[in-house]
């Protein structure tokens, strides 16, 4: 059962038995501490003091006089026996001092440890060792209470127990010594002054150093000294009964060192404190006792870290819950406003970190900072999502604007490379400004990945725009090249000569060069001003040329079909056959002249057949496209719908079979032309006999005279004769017949309408006559009835 001592002082809580004699830790210690501090923010401004010594040596009495506590004390007049059982804890802010303090002292928590070497426990030293270990683990100042006459003894002055304390201290702090110390305050009771305090001090120090030298130290602590882990102070107090005034005065002077920071010495030094907030110290002390009780290795720094981790994590979770409760509602409506978004996120982060700092900064600094960093990272992870959404919207907007401005006509006066460089720089600067603003507000820890991702987006967009620009450039160049190449190539092929292909090649190269002249930087080298490397520019040039060759290839092969070639040869033949050197029509006089002209014209026509069937220069070199128009991965020959084999090479226009067919058709057509010419000679040589003219004059003289005497008839005869000759010569009988047919049709339609009108007029007249008779009859009836009415009335 836990025992509780009722306090007789109104401003402090009763002492509690922190650890009972059954080695059980008080389960309601936290509630006791909360009552002691009364909701005040104590922070690290508290101190823990422990006392141990022999049983019935006046430990509790000393604490009650020094700190105004109410620990139970022994009544020596009744019986000397064990009074303090287990470890008791009391809280106080009142310390006995030589003069009145301006205000209450810091919160002091005093541990009264069960006395050692008691008859009640006998040889069972387990609890006293564990109690001493616990006291040194949790306290800043360890008061060693002893009598003057015990100095020089080994068991009597607790040197054996101190040896255990030293060994335990090395096991606790030796491996990871971080400057933490414990003050050993030796209070020598019943010091009557015969032996000077300095002499007693020297004796105790000598004994302590001897004990230290005999310790079994860990390897890493072999060279350590007593003073690396402990500070030593010595105080003498007079006899409580025989020297009551001196005792009280000594207690007050001792109180000055606990209450006054200006006192010399002042016992509460920073290196003594465990740097745990009060609620953390409670958890820490409970963990320490659990480790001690279970005989586990007690690593105090680790225990402090564990407590700090637990408490800081608890506070961090509270701060994070606060963050989540305010986050969504604060940012949803301002996602498109960078300044407001940054301000809201910054304020929310600061609010949560302040909440964490106020409650966690007192714990171990490395743990506090680590958890703070984790908390900030968790908030930044949420920020990253929100800021990421904002940056995605901004990125999309900037990409759209970049594309619009690159394609804007007002910027077209600048080369593509120059205008994209300017626009990309401004776009990146705007994005970088937005990202850096969030980073300056400490909302983004790292921006390298974000900026790298945006740069990749910009590069992708610029690459796309480059490709679009190049495709537009190629299309524009090919359009210009296509028009010129088709027109000029067809012209040259329609009027072939021996050097036709030389002219076509020269025209083709000049057309490409003129279309790309503004991009030419040197002979054969081009810069299309889109930021391409030399190899990429060369690739674009080759692509333009390749498409131009394709156009030429299609134009040539589509135009030079067998029928077209026959027509070209026939036109060439007829031009040479029908016209002389002055381009005047020939008048044939005899067949020999026709045969001679036929041979010349035929040879003239056939001399270009090879030109039209195979593309080669005048030096008989086959024309091969410079940029892969002939590089077919398929077979070099293919078969058309008629089963005729064709070559895929540019130069191969007609195969041998096609040439033979062209020759056959050509011969047939020119043979017909020759026959027509020879028929015209026969017609001109067949003349009308002279006697026939005389007979016509003799028999038709009267009619001839009649015509001459009638001018109108002469005029009509001349008009009709000229018209007849004109129509007959130009073959206009078809249009004349159409006009006559249309005129007759119009006359027929007009006649029908006139007849219809005449018939309609007759019908209308009859209808009017009938209508008039009926009306007169009705009027007569009405007049008769009126007369009858008049007669009746009379």
From Swiss-Prot:
Top EC group: hydrolase
Q: Where is the composition biased (Basic and acidic residues)?
A: 775-794
Cellular localization per UniProt: Endoplasmic reticulum membrane
Instruction: Identify its membrane topology class.
Output: Multi-pass membrane protein
Give the superkingdom in one word. Eukaryota
Any one Gene Ontology cellular component term annotated for this protein: endoplasmic reticulum membrane
Q: InterPro entries under this entry?
A: G_GB1_RHD3_dom (IPR030386), P-loop_NTPase (IPR027417), RHD3/Sey1 (IPR008803), Sey1/RHD3-like_3HB (IPR046758)
- GO molecular function list: GTP binding; GTPase activity
Where is it chiefly localized? endoplasmic reticulum
Residue ranges of the region described as Disordered? 770-794
Descriptive protein name: Protein SEY1
- Which organism does this sequence originate in? Zygosaccharomyces rouxii (strain ATCC 2623 / CBS 732 / NBRC 1130 / NCYC 568 / NRRL Y-229)
Lineage, uppermost ranks: Eukaryota, Fungi, Dikarya, Ascomycota, Saccharomycotina
Name of encoding gene? SEY1
